[in-house]
Amino acid sequence: MNPLRSIQHNITTPPISGGQPLDAVGPQAQQSHPKRISPSQLSQSAHQALERLSANAEHQRLASLVRNALQDGTFQFQSSNHTQVTYKASICLPADTDTVRTDHLINNELTVQARLNDQSEYDIVSAHLHGSSKAISFDVPSPPPAHGSASSVLSERTHLGMSSVLSQDAVDSSSLETPLVSSPDHSRPPSQPKPVHIGSVRRDSGSLVSDNPVVQALLSFVQADQAFPPQAASIAGVQLEMRSRRDIEQALEELKGAFTVEKAQLMSGGSSSERVDEDVNADIHIPLLLKAIERGAGAFGPGALIEIADGGQISAKAFLASCAPTITSNDDVLSEFINQKLKGDDDLQVRLGAQELLHVATKKEFQLGGLAGSIGVSSILGSAWELGASELLKNAIFGKNFSPSQYALQLAGIDSVPPFIIEAMDSFCVLVIIKGMKGELWSMKDLLPKALKAGAISSAMSFPNNVLQYAGFKSRVADLAANSITTEAAIFGAASGIPPEVKESEELMRAGLFQSMKDGVMAHPGEGMDTKETIERMTRHALDIAPGESTAVKSMGLAAIVGMIPLIASSKATGLVSEQILRIFRNAVFNPIEAIALNALALGGRVNVPGLFDSDNAKHARVAQTILARASQHMEAGDREISAEELHQMLAPRSEFLRHVGSAIVNGMNASFEAIPALVRKLGYGEAPLAERIPYQDLAVPDTSRQPAP
C-alpha cells in the first residue's frame, strides 16, 4: 500500500464533527496536544493563510470567527489522528448576522483541523462552521513543503484542496468540499481593484485606531457618535482597506461625456446684447469634481443629470455616491459596521466619490511616443545641421575662410531657418504629449497649424541670440548679460506652442462653466458673489491640477532654468569634451527640454519626500483625510463645506516653485502674443477673444427656461 496515498485520502476526507470522535493513533496521537489552542501556538504560515483567505468576501466571516475564537481561547481539543488534530468552539451568532451571505445562523459549531509541524507549531488545515440548517467550510493552503518528504505531497494536496461550500445538510458533510485551485497570488480576484488606502486596525483605550491617516480619519468618523461593537478588531492582525467599488476610469469617462459642454451662449462680435451659440466642447469635469468635494451635493443644480445604459437618467449626486469607496477587512464585523455607517451618509459618499474620480482625473501618465519623437527630431535634425549642413551652406554662399563678424546678420538669419522646421516638429510632439496627458484625442488638422506658428515664433526669437554668436560685446559683463537675455528668449520661443494651448484651455473652461451654471448643471454662485471672479477662480484652481495644463506650465519653469545650463557651463565643458560632442548633447538633451520636462514632471508626481514635497497620491490622501475629518467634526452635511482655497492649497501648494515661475512665463508670453491683436481691435478690426465674449451678467438670474425639471 502506498503510504502517501493514505495520507492524501485523509486530507481530502470531509471533516468529522465533534459528535464523531476519532481514535488517537499515529504520530499525532503520540503528541500531547493542549486542551485549548491560542494564536501564539499557530505558525506564521497559518496566520498568513488566514489573512489571504480573509481577502475573499465569502470567507471573511469564517476567518474572523476563527481569529476571535483563537483570541478568546474558546477552541477546545476534540480529537486527533495520525495526520491532524481537531478543535471545536461553540459560537452563538445573533439572528440578524449575515454569515457569508447564507441564512441567519443562531446555534453554531465552529471546528478547525490543524497539523503539528516540525517547529511544534500548528498549521491550520481547514475550518468549518455548522449551523442549524447550513454548513460553511474552507480549506487553508499549506505552508511550503519540506524537501522530498511525505509532507511535500501533503502540502500540495491541501493547497489544491481549498474549498468554499454552502450545503443544505449540516449533518451529512460528505458532500461539502469541492476542490478549488488557489494560491497566494490569486487571493484577490482579478476584477477586484487594488486598495486605495490600507491600514492596520487595533484597539486602544476602548477606541479603534490605525497607522494609516486616512483609515484613522474613517475610524474617527464612524465612532464619532457610536462605538464599534466589541467583536470588531478584537484580535491582532486586523487590516482595513478602502477600495473602489466600481471601475473608476470608466466612471470618469462617463462623467466627462455627460458634462462636456458642447455649445455656449456667448455675446456676438457686433452687439453685447445679442447671444449666439458657439461650439466650445469644454471639458469641465475637474472643476465640477472640485466643487463636489467642497460642497457635496450642493455643488449641483437641477440639470446635473447623467444618462445611463437603459436610457434613463440619474443625478450627478447619485452617480458620485456610487463611486465612493467600499470598505473591506479581514474582520468582516468591522467592515460591515463601517459600510453600514457610510451608506447612511449620502453627503459623505458624494464627496468621497468625487475625490476618487478626481484622483484618477489628475493622474499624470508618461508619454513615451511624444518624448521619443521630440528627442529624435531635435537630435537628428539639429545635429545634422550644426555638424555638417550649416558649414556647407555658409561656405557655398560666402566662400571658404569668410569673416563671421562681417556677415553676422546674414549668418544669424541662416541659423534662424532650421529652428522653424525643427521647432515646428518638436512643438507638434509637445502638443501631442499634452493631449495625451489630458486623455484627449488629437488630429493633425488641429495641431499642425499650432505647431507651425510655434516654429515661426521660435525662428524669430532665436535671431538675436544667433547674432551674438557672431558679433558679441567687447565687455564680458555686457556680453554675458546679452547672451543670458537672448538665450532665455530663444528658450521661450522654442516653447511657444505651450502658452497658447494653456490659454485656449482656460478660455474654453470658463465658457463651459458659465454655460453649465446657466443651464442649472452646476449650482449658481449665489447672491452677493461675483460670478466672473468665481468662474475665473474655479478655472485657475482646476488648471493648476489638470494633468496636461499644470504639467505644461511647470515644464516652462523647468525649461527656463535648465535651458541656461549650456550658457553657464559651456566654457568649462569645452575643455573636457570636443565641440562636436557638446553640440550633439545639446541637441539631444537641451533642445527637446520641454518634452523631457513634461515627462520628468509626470514621473516626479509619483515621488514622495516627507517634509520636502508630496506625491500626487499623498496630496489626494490628504484630501480624503480632510473630507472624513470634516464629517467627524460636523455630522450635519450642511456644516462640512471645504473652502476652495483650502482644497487648492492641498492639491497645488504655494510651495510649488516651478508652477509660479511657469505661470509668470506663460502669462507674460500670452500677453506679448496678444499685444498686437489687441491694438488691431482698438482700431476697429478683428473679433474679441472668447474670454471677452462670455456674458457673465446673464448669471445674475438663472436661466430656468433652459433647465430641465428636477
Swiss-Prot record:
GO terms for biological process: symbiont-mediated perturbation of host programmed cell death. GO terms for cellular component: extracellular region. InterPro entries: Plant_immune_effector (IPR053430). Residues 1-15 have a biased composition (Polar residues). It is found in: Secreted. Keywords: Hypersensitive response elicitation, Secreted, Virulence. Residues 1-36, 136-155, 173-207 are annotated as: Disordered. Effector protein involved in non-host recognition and able to elicit hypersensitive response (HR). This is Effector protein AvrPphD. It comes from Pseudomonas savastanoi pv. phaseolicola. The lineage of its organism: Bacteria, Pseudomonadati, Pseudomonadota, Gammaproteobacteria, Pseudomonadales. The gene is avrPphD.
